[in-house]
């Protein structure tokens, strides 16, 4: 319950709230507390090496409306979704009361709010830590800001 109230983006003061972003079919990949994030990252490294892609760690949880809004952004913007698919191997890393993934996340810089994105090279080396609050405009993720971020770090 406490995590439902923590700030999504501490830097911008935007609060997380429970609930869905919009009434649309929920086909997105969810943040799963029971997943083995370390194993998922190792599998992503193998895939990224084989496909010559970067890795995008998407850290968040089902409790965070901005995490759902970021997923919705990719669902509704086919150009961004396609670019992400072509250039990145995406790994959702759960952060919730059920599983904070402390061991995995301790290897990366402190997260100021959720969702948070880490860009890794194909070997798993951290290239960039992205506060997603900087990719927002008002109550949504800004298409141009997200695309600029994706293109800058695609390699």
Would you name each region that the model predicts?
Residues 112-155:
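Non-catalytic, surface beta->alpha helical segment in thiol-disulfide oxidoreductase systems
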Residues 16-35:
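N-proximal helix/coil linker or "cap" segments that precede and/or mark the start of modular domains
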Residues 51-62:
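Short active-site neighborhood of thiol/selenol oxidoreductases, capturing the structured segment around
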Residues 35-53:
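A short beta-strand-turn-helix
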Residues 35, 80-100:
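Thiol-based oxidoreductase modules, predominantly thioredoxin-like and allied folds used
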Residues 1-10:
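Bacterial N-terminal signal peptides
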Residues 68-83:
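Typically the conserved alpha-helix immediately C-terminal to a functionally engaged Cys/Sec
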Residues 99-112:
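Structural alpha/beta surface segment adjacent to cysteine/selenocysteine redox centers
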